[in-house]
Amino acid sequence: MTDGDYDYLIKLLALGDSGVGKTTFLYRYTDNKFNPKFITTVGIDFREKRVVYDTQGADGASGKAFKVHLQLWDTAGQERFRSLTTAFFRDAMGFLLMFDLTSQQSFLNVRNWMSQLQANAYCENPDIVLIGNKADLPDQREVNERQARELAEKYGIPYFETSAATGQNVEKSVETLLDLIMKRMEKCVEKTQVPDTVNGGNSGKLDGEKPAEKKCAC
């Protein structure tokens, strides 16, 4: 895909405490590489990737394929950058909420991040995937899978255990979030059937005629 050659622009935001591995996770997803020497993110950074999203018909058959430009925003986890980070919440269409499987404190802080999300996101129930990162370090693990799954079930969101080092579930977790977002937009379009004018967007249904950045009420 060339610049501008896409149907949808989707912005995702990676959230979580400093040191949980957000930067290495996103780098693994966009470049399929692992760099353990990244320095702590200061403020906001982002990476990009183009993907093809295949829709499914009611009968389960493959539908139309859409070209999606993903912007993956990487946020600083430190408290001093919190006001800057929350300013980006309303622009994001989905969230990768991450904690470190080797840090119980980062897991406990997921609740604080959820509170900030619910207060600052574009709606009260945005699309979120909970991610327990550093699954490649089982000997250092402090958070068991049952704890994490129970928390994800409480919030009604998917949960994945990932590793930026090995690539485990990195792509799958982002694909799951994208699928949630695209299905939300499709339902929104079906309900409204009104022309979308955002960024010269689509004609009220997922027809992929022009690049569009869409949001939908929760």
Swiss-Prot record:
SUPFAM superfamilies: P-loop containing nucleoside triphosphate hydrolases
Signal peptide: none
Transmembrane segments: none
Chain span(s) of sequence motif Effector region: 38-46
Lipidation (S-geranylgeranyl cysteine): C216, C218
Disulfide bond annotation, renumbered to this chain: C123-C188
Pfam family, one: Ras
GO MF entries: G protein activity; GDP binding; GTP binding; GTPase activity; myosin V binding; protein domain specific binding
Residue(s) carrying Cysteine methyl ester: C218
Extent of Basic and acidic residues compositional bias: 206-218
Tissue occurrence: Expressed abundantly in the stomach and is predominantly localized at the apical region of gastric-surface mucus cells. Also expressed in the brain and spleen.
PTM sites of type N-acetylthreonine: T2
Binding positions for GTP per the UniProt entry: 16-24, 74-78, 133-136, 163-165
Residues covered by region (Disordered): 194-218
Activity-regulation annotation: Regulated by guanine nucleotide exchange factors (GEFs) which promote the exchange of bound GDP for free GTP, GTPase activating proteins (GAPs) which increase the GTP hydrolysis activity, and GDP dissociation inhibitors which inhibit the dissociation of the nucleotide from the GTPase. Activated by GEFs such as DENND10.
UniProt keyword list: Acetylation, Disulfide bond, Endosome, GTP-binding, Hydrolase, Lipoprotein, Membrane, Methylation, Nucleotide-binding, Prenylation
A single BP term in Gene Ontology: multivesicular body sorting pathway
Top-level taxon in the UniProt lineage: Eukaryota
Localization per record: Membrane; Late endosome
This protein's GO CC annotations: apical plasma membrane; axon cytoplasm; Golgi apparatus; Golgi stack; late endosome; melanosome; multivesicular body membrane; synaptic vesicle membrane
Documented effect of changing D91G: Strongly reduces the interaction with MLPH
EC primary class: hydrolase
UniProt family annotation: Belongs to the small GTPase superfamily. Rab family.
Quaternary structure, from the entry: Interacts with SYTL2, SYTL4, MYRIP and MLPH. Interacts with RPH3A and RPH3A. Interacts (GDP-bound form preferentially) with DENND10.
Described function: Small GTPase which cycles between active GTP-bound and inactive GDP-bound states. In its active state, binds to a variety of effector proteins to regulate homeostasis of late endocytic pathway, including endosomal positioning, maturation and secretion. Plays a role in NTRK2/TRKB axonal anterograde transport by facilitating the association of NTRK2/TRKB with KLC1. May be involved in targeting uroplakins to urothelial apical membranes.
Protein name: Ras-related protein Rab-27B
Naturally occurring in which organism (per UniProt): Mus musculus (Mouse)
Gene this protein is translated from: Rab27b
